[in-house]
Amino acid sequence: MVDYIVEYDYDAVHDDELTIRVGEIIRNVKKLQEEGWLEGELNGRRGMFPDNFVKEIKRETEPKDDNLPIKRERQGNVASLVQRISTYGLPAGGIQPHPQTKAIKKKTKKRQCKVLFDYSPQNEDELELIVGDVIDVIEEVEEGWWSGTLNNKLGLFPSNFVKELESTEDGETHNAQEESEVPLTGPTSPLPSPGNGSEPAPGSVAQPKKIRGIGFGDIFKEGSVKLRTRTSSSETEEKKTEKPLILQPLGSRTQNVEVTKPDVDGKIKAKEYCRTLFPYTGTNEDELTFREGEIIHLISKETGEAGWWKGELNGKEGVFPDNFAVQISELDKDFPKPKKPPPPAKGPAPKPDLSAAEKKAFPLKAEEKDEKSLLEQKPSKPAAPQVPPKKPTAPTKASNLLRSPGAVYPKRPEKPVPPPPPAAKINGEVSIISSKIDTEPVSKPKLDPEQLPVRPKSVDLDAFVARNSKETDDVNFDDIASSENLLHLTANRPKMPGRRLPGRFNGGHSPTQSPEKTLKLPKEDDSGNLKPLEFKKDASYSSKSSLSTPSSASKVNTAAFLTPLELKAKAEADDGKRNSVDELRAQIIELLCIVDALKKDHGKELEKLRKELEEEKAMRSNLEVEIAKLKKAVLLS
């Protein structure tokens, strides 16, 4: 079974999940069939937890740690004394095995890569690569970027510019182990570490070298560079694997170690950074105000109030809600790096790091196991999530109203027959009037007495034609209800007086004319052919009348251009106007009468009031006289 240390907080969503906090150690962890989830034991309870919230703890040398004190107790020989002398009085039990542990870790975990292409750093935390350089790989920071050491410098470099070498041979590992023993176990270079390692058999063989180093005092001869290199890489590796279990160094140290160790501690402290996910405006003086994407130096997570962290931003210290930010490492505080070369394409896509801070801002709905695929996408550890989730509820844009579908307008109906208005009531009666015209052509021309001398015999002809065509008109009267007749009614609407109809005098007729008109027009043409004869017979009379009364002749010509239908419409219109004028006059006269009556009534009321006022004055004067008499009588008595 493997143990894991928690790097990010996680709140359990289901009963079979564990609630974990940063720094806790989960025991007896095993992988599950479901990708992205592990199962382990914490505080006596076993459950599931996401694998990207924890980090594996290498426990390869732990079994030997328990045997270490037993060996030292049993030995009781010069070797234990040499260990005490080499550390100048420091307890050797807790310090001595670490160089061996580091050597063993190098043997099992050491990764190296060779530079294939030159690379110039674009940021301060990047390494400069030259073809042929060998880099000690520490960890994979994010997809396409690794962290490693080159020439005593720790930094980032693109993974697609290097090629990973195979693990070093055992001989090389042992040589590295022996080299590390000399500087690290000498009198001036003990280095404590959080983990406990064991002292294997080769360690006891290397002890005489320590004695020689103490005796001659020149243990750093030709090894100063190796000391710095080995110390930097090993300490950085320890920092990566056992970061939460940092212990304070015991005893005095050499100047060289004191210079390097604070640097490592500083790097560890510098990892306490967090990136803001959402903008926040402080409501109190001790709160920070920040925008999205800013980097806050995390000072403390323990502020005495749950859900609040203490940090520093732009030189100001204050508290801020932890669900508005996500913790990142120092190497990621400059993320994103747009100028870096694109990382090579890899199979599994990185998944967003669903930390507890993000979960508080927008809780995950992981009730369904299908949605746990969000956790299955592992982020590049310990980088911040590359795809930040949606922000908390923002004043929205909305939210989002449903767009109503476009109104479907009904099909435009055909234009109906206009209802007969009072002034245009004749339009609806054209068919009836037309039949009346045929039956009563004599009555309408008689309205104008000046028209009779012009056509003295046409009256009899029209009456004759009307009598002959009456039966035909009655038979075809039912055809008027057709659609053609409706259109015909609109086409033959009465025109203005003084305008001649094109169908009457030009010889043409509308194709939509009713059967009555088609029968009537030829007969009228026949009557028109007879009119010249009538004019010749009464030429003298017509000339005299035209000379004597030129105005009447113009009236006759105007009346000749009007059809009986138009004459009737004109007469009715004139009658309507006259009636309306008469009604208005009657109303005005009635109003005047009413006003006069009101004036009379008002005058009568005023007279009554005046009389009453005079009477009241007289009564008052009488009362005053009587009161005066009474006063005199009272005074005299």
Swiss-Prot record:
Keywords: Cell cycle, Cell division, Cell junction, Cell projection, Coiled coil, Cytoplasm, Cytoskeleton, Isopeptide bond, Mitosis, Phosphoprotein, Repeat, SH3 domain, SH3-binding, Ubl conjugation. Disruption phenotype: Death at 6 to 7 weeks of age from renal failure. Mice show defects in epithelial foot processes, accompanied by mesangial cell hyperplasia and extracellular matrix deposition. The modification Phosphothreonine is found at residue 563. GO terms for biological process: actin filament organization; actin filament polymerization; adipose tissue development; apoptotic process; cell differentiation; cell division; cell population proliferation; cell-cell adhesion mediated by cadherin. One of its GO terms (cellular component) is nuclear envelope lumen. PROSITE patterns: SH3. Residues 341-351 have a biased composition (Pro residues). Residues 540-555 have a biased composition (Low complexity). InterPro entries: CD2AP_SH3_1, CD2AP_SH3_3, CD2AP_SH_2, Endophilin_SH3RF, SH3-like_dom_sf, SH3_domain. It is found in: Cytoplasm, Cytoskeleton; Cell projection, Ruffle; Cell junction. Phosphorylated on tyrosine residues; probably by c-Abl, Fyn and c-Src. Residues 1-59, 108-167, 269-330 form the SH3 domain. A motif (SH3-binding) lies at residues 336-352, 378-397, 410-422. Its main location: cytoplasm. Expressed in podocytes (at protein level). Residues 166-209, 226-254, 333-455, 488-555 are annotated as: Disordered. Residues 166-177, 356-379, 437-449, 517-539 have a biased composition (Basic and acidic residues). Seems to act as an adapter protein between membrane proteins and the actin cytoskeleton. In collaboration with CBLC, modulates the rate of RET turnover and may act as regulatory checkpoint that limits the potency of GDNF on neuronal survival. Controls CBLC function, converting it from an inhibitor to a promoter of RET degradation. May play a role in receptor clustering and cytoskeletal polarity in the junction between T-cell and antigen-presenting cell. May anchor the podocyte slit diaphragm to the actin cytoskeleton in renal glomerolus. Also required for cytokinesis. Potential homodimerization is mediated by the coiled coil domain. This is CD2-associated protein. The lineage of its organism: Eukaryota, Metazoa, Chordata, Craniata, Vertebrata. The gene is Cd2ap.
